[in-house]
């Protein structure tokens, strides 16, 4: 019977491959990276995880390249975010470091969509939902729009409606209204509906309270 340490060694094989850069054949760069902060990776691993990476690496641009090692630049990501992204790709158990997930949930959510890695998107969505509060609900609702993600949109929308008196008085809401007027109208309509259905009539004076 295999011991836990043997299992850990087995599961960590791909991570070791990444760390030791053994037979690495592609260089990954973030938008803020230079040549000294590139991440050396393996095409087969990237292709196995993402159809988008497969299309990139099979494109005419890369096939025609005379370079010994091609570079893929993920310009939308910072180097630290790219490190977390690549580390996830190399994990065979489908998990991600909780600290990395908490810190980079939004950027990884975008990356998961762009590079078509649904499981990572699910993990990021769950983290974002668990962290929802009145101070971040607007930005998370905004994040859920492109592409539209109902599973993230709905709890963010509900959080906003529940805390509308606090949220609507802040400067962030004014900016949100300017950038997303249609969404703002939906929020106000839902808030009015919620308010009207929650009000009761006093039996003595026939006034709402």
Curated annotation (Swiss-Prot):
GO biological process: protein ubiquitination
This protein's pathway: Protein modification; protein ubiquitination
Keyword terms, alphabetized: Ubl conjugation pathway
Matches recorded under Pfam families: BTB
PROSITE patterns found in the cross-reference section: BTB
InterPro entries: At1g01640-like, BTB/POZ_dom, SKP1/BTB/POZ_sf
SUPFAM superfamilies with a match to the protein in the record: POZ domain (SSF54695)
Organism superkingdom: Eukaryota
Domain annotation BTB: ranges: 24-98
Domain remark from Swiss-Prot or TrEMBL: The BTB/POZ domain mediates the interaction with some component of ubiquitin ligase complexes.
PANTHER family: BTB DOMAIN-CONTAINING PROTEIN, BTB/POZ DOMAIN CONTAINING PROTEIN, EXPRESSED-RELATED
Annotated function: May act as a substrate-specific adapter of an E3 ubiquitin-protein ligase complex (CUL3-RBX1-BTB) which mediates the ubiquitination and subsequent proteasomal degradation of target proteins.
Protein name (record): Putative BTB/POZ domain-containing protein At2g40450
Organism of derivation: Arabidopsis thaliana
Source lineage: Eukaryota, Viridiplantae, Streptophyta, Embryophyta, Tracheophyta
